[in-house]
Design a protein with these regions (language model features):
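Short, small-residue-biased leader/transition segments that mark boundaries at the very start
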Residues: 1-5
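Beta-propeller blade signature
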Residues: 6-15, 67-72, 123-137, 197-209
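Surface-exposed loop and turn segments in beta-propeller and other repeat-based domains
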Residues: 15-44, 80-96, 139-156
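Structural signature of eukaryotic scaffold interfaces centered on beta-propeller domains
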Residues: 31-58, 97-109, 156-164
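Short consensus segments that form the blades of beta-propeller domains
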Residues: 60-61, 118-123, 194-198
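Conserved beta-strand positions in repeat-built beta-propeller and related beta-rich domains
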Residues: 62-65, 112
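Loop/turn-rich, solvent-exposed surfaces of beta-rich toroidal or solenoidal domains
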Residues: 95-164, 172-173
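Blade-level signature of beta-propeller repeat domains, shared across WD40, Kelch, NHL, RCC1
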Residues: 163-216
Length: 216
């Protein structure tokens, strides 16, 4: 028996709705539960928020943690599978979820998250960053570094889209930039920005923009 998650989109032109269905065997929660019956304590933890709907040129990519398939939803309302994972998340214990980050015409930035949490150390949900190269048809582990630092400083490639040009953004506290500037860790444009900051300055917003690219 298969289940499916149902979402709807609403037309801005005439207000009509269309249902979107993503099939899967059973709904899987991302939460890890904790209970202490003697103390009457019950709570759960979940990993960081992940974007289930990601803009991709004139389409949208749909991710459901209970499904083994990632879909591209087109403007003509066709839903096309673009990634099929194996082994099935339905067969894993603990489950390892697959989430997508920034998408380009060549690369898919992805992340796996293991449904595992230690309530004593308050650590868990270990992750692995993966990159799929559509041209080479290969998957790699990856790290993206910020070239405005003299040392290796990783950039989070999670999708936080602003519009079709800005794929994601990150906030950097002014105090952290001032400290890095004084220690000589900055260069290029970020060094120039940090030189003008003080402790009362607002955080600096770093934008991750798409290069000009054609629809894949």
């Amino acid at each position: 028996r298969q289940m499916c998650i149902r979402d709807s989109i609403i037309s801005k032109q005439d207000g009509t709705t269309k249902q979107i269905q993503i099939p899967f065997k059973e709904k899987i929660s991302m939460a890890v539960n904790y209970s202490d019956k003697a103390k009457d304590i019950y709570y759960n933890v979940i990993p960081d928020n992940y974007n289930p709907i990601i803009p991709y040129f004139d389409c949208w990519v749909l991710v459901e943690q209970s499904s083994d398939t990632v879909y591209k939803y087109q403007s003509d309302h066709k839903m096309i599978p673009i990634i099929a994972r194996t082994p099935s998340v339905q067969s894993m214990n603990p489950e390892v979820f697959l989430f997508l980050g920034i998408l380009t015409n060549r690369y898919y930035f992805m992340e796996t998250v293991k449904k595992e949490y230690n309530f004593e150390t308050h650590e868990g949900f270990p992750t692995t960053d993966l990159l799929y190269d559509k041209q080479e048809k290969a998957i790699f582990e990856y790290i993206v570094y910020n070239n405005d630092y003299s040392e290796k400083r990783a950039v989070n490639m999670k999708s936080l889209p602003v519009d079709d040009k800005i794929a994601s953004w990150q906030s950097i506290e002014a105090s952290q930039l001032i400290e890095d500037y004084e220690k000589g860790k900055l260069k290029r444009r970020l060094k120039e920005i940090a030189a003008s900051l003080d402790e009362e300055s607002n955080p600096v917003i770093m934008l991750i923009k798409h290069k000009k690219q054609t629809n894949p």
